[in-house]
Structure formats: structure tokens, C-alpha cells
Amino acid sequence: YDFDLGSSVMGNSSLQAAYIQNVDLRYEWYPSNGEQVSIALFYKHFENPIEWTYTMSGGTDPVYSYVNAKGANNYGIEVDIRKNLDFIGMRNFSFSFNGAWIKSKVQFKEGGNNIDRPMQGQSPYLINTGLFYNNPDKGWNAAVLYNRIGKRIIGVGNRYGSSSEGDARNIPNSYEMPRNSIDLSASKKFGKLEIKATVRDLLAERYYFKQFEDVIVNGQARTIEEVT
């Protein structure tokens, strides 16, 4: 049972193994010791990707299971930077940045009621940055880390029935909305002894899960959302 989404989860004995083909083109530059700049273009093809999907249930609670899609294609660009900050007078400090932009599209089996969407669990962008302090002479280490991911599908919706027969039922995709996360850590060595302190998710922002559904109101198309 998933308490965050208030839904039951069941297995699927008919699942097929997923296969991934990956191609990437990467440029890397190392300006000095401990520094790196890299840019990568990548493409991934998924065959039979496994997704967490809403399935029909006779009960009142939603039920999710793991289902194979026909395929999926992901492509994008990734940038990775590691830089010492001595050049601006911040000795023993360094900075890192990792960011990615990803375009994702799922391929569906013929005859289904699905519409174009990204692969479940895939965010359109990822951002990770960090500020680090390292002083080996005095035994100090510290870091501030920031993370953010774009809106992503965590539960694939489904469509059942036929509009012409009056039994159509639409279960929208469930999305995890973007949130900011900051982690702090510091450590100090005393000979062979090390003391370390860590604070995770300093901002403690709420997790929001939303469903969006297109409806017609007074002859105009609108999108309504439900928040959990």
C-alpha cells in the first residue's frame, strides 16, 4: 500500500524484462587538478519499459501495478562543472554544478487509449549544485548541496470504456511537483577521530502530488487539478 498516494499496489506476473540501448557523445576538459568541465549529448531507447500504472479495480480505492509499455525514447544534454574558487580569493573552496535537460516520449501498443507523455519517473530537468570547503591542514570539511527536479509522472493514469457507449472513465496521471532541497554537512578530524554533523532537507518543503484533467466548462476547455 502506498500511503503517500492513498492507493494499493499489486504485482504483475506477466511483466517482460526491459532492455535499454544507450548512446552518448561527451566532451571533457580538465583545466587543472580537481577541476572538470564536461558536456554530453545522450540518447536512450527503452524496449518494454516497466511503469507504475493505474489498473482497473472493482473497489473504491485506486490500485496501481507494474505494466510494460511498448517502448520509450529519452534524449537530452547534460552539463557537469567542477571548479576551484581560488581565483576569487576563496581558498580551499570549490563549486560543482550538474544539470540535465531531458526529452522523453513513450511508445504505446496499437489499440490503446493512451496519449503522448513522458516516461513514468522521468523529469524534464535535473539540477544539482554544491559548495565545498576542504582544509586538510586543519581537518575541516563542509558542504552545502542543492537539488531540484522537474515535474514528473509517478503514477501512470489510464482510460477505460468508450465515450460513444457512455461508459468512458479517465484516470489522470499522478505527478510529483518540483521541490527544492538543501543538505548541509560538516566534519572535523582530531587525529584518528572524526566528528561529523549532517542536516538533510533543510528547507523541508512539502511534497505535492497532483492530477490534471482536461474538462469543458461553458464551452471552453480548461484543466483542473487535484492536490494530495
Where are these regions (language model features)?
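C-terminal beta-signal and adjacent terminal beta-strands/loops
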Residues: 47-48, 136, 148-164, 187-228
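Transmembrane beta-barrel domains of outer membrane proteins
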Residues: 26-28, 40, 80-84, 130-134, ...
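Outer-membrane beta-barrel strand-turn architecture
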Residues: 19, 29-33, 45, 83-89, ...
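Flexible, solvent-exposed loop segments that connect beta-strands
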Residues: 58-65, 107-118, 156-173, 214-225
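Gram-negative outer-membrane beta-barrel transporters
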Residues: 42-46, 63-156
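Outer-membrane beta-barrel signature, preferentially recognizing the C-terminal barrel domain
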Residues: 1-38, 43-46, 57-84, 120-125, ...
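Outer-membrane beta-barrel translocator domains and adjoining extracellular loop/strand segments
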Residues: 1-8, 49-57, 102, 106-115, ...
